[in-house]
Amino acid sequence: MTTTPTVESAGTQTAAPLVRLVDAGKNYGNILALQGVTLEVSGGEVTCVLGDNGAGKSTLIKIIAGLHQHDHGTYEVEGEPVKFNSPREALNHGIATVYQDLAVVPLMPVWRNFFLGNEVRKGPLMDLAFMRRTTKKELLDMGIDLRDVDQPIGTLSGGERQCVAISRAVYFGAKVLILDEPTAALGVKQSGVVLRYIIQARERGLGVIFITHNPHHAYPVGDRFLLLKRGRVLGYYQKNEVTRDELTGLMAGGAELEELSHELESGGGAAAEAAHVLEAEVKELGIGHAPGAD
């Protein structure tokens, strides 16, 4: 497997990617939290960033979103080198982040949350009719037909609240949408709802960065896959270069599972029985070797 990522243009596109990082890294004091990360995000594509806890996903998000600055490598937005001082600067460049703990006020109506901090005024008063009408239309464009945008947003399902946040970011000019674990706290049905919204955002020409630890959610919607482990790049693939099973295997840590299986087997008794079960699961996942290793 080739773990050194290479940046390639998608299809025949000649325009600069919306976002490009080359050999980017971040230090926290003496701790190297992120090292050698290269990725690109183009309009109309979903780039999935996968990794377990502590892989470096949050650090990567914070660099792209303007919360932290990178210490190594380069970061470009539409071909322009950048080093943001704040999330507002990133937002001004069209980079919006939807975090797992959504920035919504549960008791406020849907339309108030949609325009929160960006209220439209007609003279000295808020233009309530415009904001209600716009909220309903924008949500409908994303596939949610709310009967009443005056209902508290807390009454919506988790997937629907994610949709409101995504739709809000699109309406206010996002070109790149960073989604931080949007399906982590959702059930199967609501996860499917969010994945459909991700596809719709891609079809509207946005570049989407989908942060997740779940390859089964990433693979159906992703065009590129960046795998991180302990701050380093484990692999960077386009969709035609890796299967879902291989992606799952890399996430599951095939080599580590095989090593554990051998350790258990040498212990005999119940440990050996557990090793046989684990070995069967490893084979079923098709892990233990990297894509292209054969």
Identify the role of each PLM range.
Residues T2-D294:
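Glycine-rich phosphate-binding loops of nucleotide-dependent enzymes
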